[in-house]
Amino acid sequence: MCGIVGYIGFRNASDFLLDGLHRLEYRGYDSAGIAVFHKGEVAVRKRAGRVCELDRLIETDGVEGTVGIGHTRWATHGETTDVNSHPHVGGNGEVVLVHNGVVENHNSLRTQLQTLGYVFRTTTDTEVIAHLIAHHLEKRIETDGEICTHEACVEVVETAMRKIEGTYGVAVLFRDCPDLIVAARAGSPLVVGIGRGEYFVASDAGPLVG
């Protein structure tokens, strides 16, 4: 099973995310990664292999920030490679997400999105969700002239996920809303925690304890 963890607060998000991913190792996985808001961008670091290998990557090529998401992947679509590891990026980088579950209609959605000009860099079903959310966000901005607000981000996730067939749990970052994580689920577990000036999301309560 895949593992998801997310954090908004005042601590170094990378430290919390890595600790959370270690606590989710019991679920089984073949790769791991994190995405953190860092100097105005969403910085993604990911590796095929164990969380300890991701630890070493962060030690040498770390990112500092107080908002981020993390993931451990057990491959169901696509090989076990660095590029297929989560998090995945949608559109032109405006959406970054992690996903637990299976997108049963990913082939048809991939074809539709490729027709619209979206370029796929992985062989995963998850990248379909990232591009789909980005598409609805871009369409909303073009149609309404609306900037990327919290409300808009929530609504485009809702719109995109209605087109997904299968089970899912997702945690989504938006480049232009650096204080927001949108989480959604259907059939895959997610838990939410609220602390003093901190907010958490995870596949189970393990990363939230302590």
Locate the predicted segments by residue.
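Conserved short alpha-helical segments that host acidic/polar catalytic motifs at enzyme active sites
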Residues: 1-210
